[in-house]
């Protein structure tokens, strides 16, 4: 049986999201911090202890890690081992025997995308397919099938990365907050940029989802997660659900599933 509280850590290129789950699998605490490649294991242990203390949260007894930044994931594992006496489980395609990865090179699939597979299961209902749109440094479209099948997907440039590239190459354009304007037709530079970056990005997401659905042999539910999902909520017409904790919850469910298999 798994030990609780369980610490779930989703390490992205830009942001790291952490959560504590109780014995029912519910997330009782969540945190969102910057991914820092310069922090050593002892630094990370101090940061974790500070997060737990400030929130009045219990110390975890087990941990599961998903990382797309391998050195950072390794440092988290060392921090948990040295200071919390926890052998963290690091997610990969090789250590999930009940998952079928239908890619040319199955071992290349990112750990976060496997977590999204588990997180998407609750949304399948009577359908055989789901698409998770994960808005991060890149925007991932993860296509999964019933029976824990990872079918592939699409990788696109993240909205903030696109905006940063534009600002870097056009010195006279002001840096803006990525939020939806009231109308598509801009009356000033900031408004016009927001329209192009937010509405344009939403149209890309809708268009790619339509293409994915056209290629699948059955209906698919689409679920959005990641920080930028809040910005496009209500704008994207092809997204059915928004779930900011989908990847974390997927980590918890993956851990529980692994414990059941053992």
Swiss-Prot record:
InterPro entries: ATPase_NBD, Type_III_PanK
Subcellular location(s) of the protein: Cytoplasm
Record-annotated active site: 112 (proton acceptor)
Enzyme class: transferase
Assigned EC number: 2.7.1.33
Main location (coarse class): cytoplasm
Binding site for ATP: 10-17, 137
Keyword annotations from UniProtKB, A to Z: ATP-binding, Coenzyme A biosynthesis, Cytoplasm, Kinase, Metal-binding, Nucleotide-binding, Potassium, Transferase
Pfam family, one: Pan_kinase
Cofactor binding comment, as recorded: A monovalent cation. Ammonium or potassium.
Binding site for K(+): 134
Cofactor(s) named in the record: NH4(+); K(+)
Gene Ontology cellular component terms for the protein in this record: cytoplasm
Subunit annotation: Homodimer.
Listed name of the protein: Type III pantothenate kinase
């Amino acid at each position: 049986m798994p030990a609780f509280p369980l610490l779930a850590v989703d390490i992205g290129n830009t942001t790291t999201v952490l959560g504590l789950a109780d014995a029912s699998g519910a997330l009782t605490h969540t945190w969102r911090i910057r991914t820092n490649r310069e922090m050593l294991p002892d630094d990370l242990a101090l940061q974790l202890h500070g997060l737990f203390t400030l929130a009045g949260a219990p110390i975890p007894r087990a941990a599961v890690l998903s990382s797309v930044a391998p050195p950072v994931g390794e440092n988290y594992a060392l921090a948990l081992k040295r200071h919390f006496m926890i052998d963290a489980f690091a997610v990969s395609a090789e250590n999930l025997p009940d998952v079928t990865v239908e890619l040319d090179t199955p071992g290349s699939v990112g750990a976060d995308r496997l977590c999204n597979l588990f997180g998407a299961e609750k949304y399948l209902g009577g359908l055989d397919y789901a698409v998770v749109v994960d808005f991060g440094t890149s925007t991932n479209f993860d296509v999964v099938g019933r029976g824990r099948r990872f079918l592939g997907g699409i990788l696109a440039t993240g909205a903030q990365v696109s905006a940063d590239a534009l600002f870097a190459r056009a010195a006279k354009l002001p840096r803006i907050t990525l939020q939806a304007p009231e109308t598509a037709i801009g009356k000033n530079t900031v408004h016009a940029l927001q329209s192009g970056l937010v509405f344009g990005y939403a149209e890309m997401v809708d268009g790619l989802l339509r293409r994915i659905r056209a290629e699948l042999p059955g209906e698919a539910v689409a679920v959005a997660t990641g920080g930028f999902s809040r910005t496009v909520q209500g704008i994207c017409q092809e997204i059915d659900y928004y779930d900011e904790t989908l990847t974390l919850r997927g980590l918890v469910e993956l851990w529980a599933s692994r414990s059941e298999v053992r």
